[in-house]
């Protein structure tokens, strides 16, 4: 779990904490949880290291997907993707529209597959992370979800 923020600390990172707890409750192991500033190269370096680690199968990022001057998660991570998972951003924005209306057009949530690791990039709000988890991620990271899920494409499976 990687929080992208210039202001969050371990104590104030409610989105990262939510994702860590949700993953644990669903039976997943957490290899690492970090906070990185909104910097393309620092973000790319951490995620590249995790992609290269055979123990890391899924990366969830929160933050840096908006339009402020320093939001850079899409620019940092999209070049690392071997394949994009366009449906994640599409479904996330559709779910978000029911909650925040037209403001959802400002979401640049995205996902991709890199070296057998799936990477999901969500906005920084805890509500957005909850929407993504409950509406997409919980099922797609569950090997028993039918008709399909991402477990079969992960490096370790």
Predicted region positions:
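Non-catalytic beta/alpha edge segments that cap or flank active sites
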Residues: 2-157
């Amino acid at each position: 779990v990687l929080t992208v923020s210039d202001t969050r600390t371990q104590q104030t990172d409610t989105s990262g904490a939510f994702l860590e707890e949700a993953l644990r409750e669903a039976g997943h192991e957490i290899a690492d949880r970090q906070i990185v500033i909104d910097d393309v190269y620092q973000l790319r370096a951490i995620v590249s290291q995790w992609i290269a680690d055979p123990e890391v199968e899924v990366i969830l990022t929160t933050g840096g997907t908006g339009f402020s001057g320093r939001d850079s998660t899409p620019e940092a991570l999209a070049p690392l993707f071997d394949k994009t998972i366009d449906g994640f951003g599409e479904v996330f924005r559709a779910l978000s529209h029911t909650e925040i209306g037209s403001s959802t057009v400002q979401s640049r949530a995205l996902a991709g597959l890199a070296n057998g690791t799936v990477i999901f990039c969500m906005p920084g709000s805890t509500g957005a992370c909850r929407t993504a988890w409950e509406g997409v991620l919980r099922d797609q990271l569950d090997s028993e979800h039918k008709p399909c899920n991402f477990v079969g494409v992960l490096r370790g499976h």
